[in-house]
Amino acid sequence: MAIANKNIIFVAGLGGIGFDTSREIVKRGPKNLVILDRIENPAAIAELKALNPKVTVTFYPYDVTVSVAETTKLLKTIFDKLKTVDLLINGAGILDDHQIERTIAVNFTGTVNTITAIMSFWDKRKGGPGGVIANVCSVTGFNAIYQVPVYSASKAAALSFTNSLARLAPITGVTAYSINPGITKTTLVHKFNSWLDVEPRVAELLLEHPTQTTLQCAQNFVKAIEANQNGAIWKVDLGTLEAIEWTKHWDSHI
């Protein structure tokens, strides 16, 4: 997918990886970049607008834990304004295994609900034009960081959901792929809680190993967007982009 002249919605486009990815997107000249985030950051929005004045950058406050109905209402406002949306990026995420319910709500349920809401506008069975979804999951969806099993499981769930969305594309007209960053130097990983405090030093121990910068992650994120491969499972780790082959151990045969 060429980003130029496209209309893009980016959930959590002002976060660590999100903001650098927003920068890379704006450089490529989309028609509209609509950022949905929990906390407004006028300075960040101003920076994006200045980076490429030809791009219309707008912000709407959005908490992914709201209901599908509330999300649908917000999306209707956006679709009424833009008429079409080409790409939805779901980037919301938290890392804190003390907050079990919120971790699942933000990392998994919020993604499911946001996508469920946008299907009202995209699903070809309802006369929609289809669309593309990029879900930010995690390498922990492949193999857990076992000291944060709630976070890891929430990302595995998001990855599984994305894989199913891709298989449903012939029915819905909506394609999907996952972006799975490795350990990236953001505020998310500088300090976080393990489940039941099984490893109080989990953040410190994790950062003893090689990491990537948010810019490295963002640059490869955009390459994955441009590749636009339905069902792709992209590993974005240590400054590299790699398509992962998923091993099938069972098939429903339906």
From Swiss-Prot:
PROSITE patterns associated with the record: ADH_SHORT
Enzyme Commission number(s): 1.1.1.1
Outcome following mutation: E226Q: In strain: VRF
UniProt source species: Drosophila mojavensis
Name by which UniProt lists this protein: Alcohol dehydrogenase 2
Complexes and interactors: Homodimer.
Effect recorded for V236L: In strain: MJS 115, MJS 122, MJS 127, MJS 132, MJS 133, MJS 14, MJS 147.2F, MJS 154, MJS 16F, MJS 36, MJS 58.2, MJS 68, MJS 84, MJS 87, MJS 93 and VRF
GO cellular-component term (any): cytoplasm
One Pfam short name: adh_short
